[in-house]
Amino acid sequence: MLQLFYFSAIIASVILNFVGIIMNLFIMVVNCKTWVKSHRISSSDRILFSLGITRFLMLGLFLVNTIFFVSSNTERSVYLSAFFVLCFMFXDSSSLWFVTLLNILYCVKITNFQHSVFLLLKQNISPKIPRLLLACVLISAFTTCLYITLSQASPFPELVTKRNNTSFNTHEGILSLVVSLVLSSSLQFIINVTSASLLIHSLRRHIQKMQKNATGFWNPQTEAHVGAMKLMIYFLILYIPYSVATLVQYLPFYVGMDMGTKAICLIFATLYSPGHSVLIIITHPKLKTTAKKILCFKK
């Protein structure tokens, strides 16, 4: 029964990856078309375009690795597995930093704080987006290189046996993996929670101000607050289980877990990227309108 559940989780994982690939390809194409047509692109769309590319490559790599691992009956070098892991780590870290940068941009642009730091950020963050995107890539490259450097103390075995008798020494790379994930994920989590908290505080102040002025509090600024806040909260709801599931999959005791627990970890680890991509589309006016036209739901 548990084996059937685990097999179903693998099938669901493959389907979710296909959905994620299609959603991110859609995000890439729409933003690229707008960029080419108008010869300009907004800061948020630039981040979304970069995020779409990274997730498209990451999900494609994950899908190829999953299909190869499930279907292959021949022995394969563990170095190939290591290559997949390193590429996935780099692309995954980059995509998470891009989302973090997107949340920072929303927070800075939408909140109405009059502090000098916020005013300075409002004026200067948009021109700095290309450099900040490059910084996200460099940080991801650093954490990936850190993993490689620390794992050199525990060299990989020569071969991984056939899929029905696969055995990994999970203790060998666990320290380097945990350090790399914690260094990157902790800072991302703190920044995203802070951005969401500032948005909530700004929304509360805005509503109180509108109520004092005896005017309706639901206006374009309120709508922008709520839309960005929903996207951030949904991101955190998907991101926290994803981070835990991803880390658990590489812990030493994961090999001894039952099939049911492994299946749950696999589903949570796979759900984040496609789920968040769908949320981006349905909360982004231009992407949502284009999606409705494609699906023939235009009124």
From Swiss-Prot:
What domain of life does the UniProt record list for this protein's source? Eukaryota
Its ancestry begins with:
Eukaryota, Metazoa, Chordata, Craniata, Vertebrata
Output the Gene3D superfamilies linked to this UniProt entry: Rhodopsin 7-helix transmembrane proteins
List, alphabetically, the InterPro entries matched: TAS2R, TAS2R4
Topological type in the membrane:
Multi-pass membrane protein
Q: Which Pfam families match?
A: TAS2R
Record field: transmembrane: 10-30, 47-67, 82-102, 132-152, 173-193, 231-251, 263-283
Spell out the protein name for this chain. Taste receptor type 2 member 4
This protein's UniProt keywords: Cell membrane, Cell projection, Cilium, G-protein coupled receptor, Glycoprotein, Membrane, Receptor, Sensory transduction, Taste, Transducer, Transmembrane, Transmembrane helix
The entry's other comment says: Several bitter taste receptors are expressed in a single taste receptor cell.
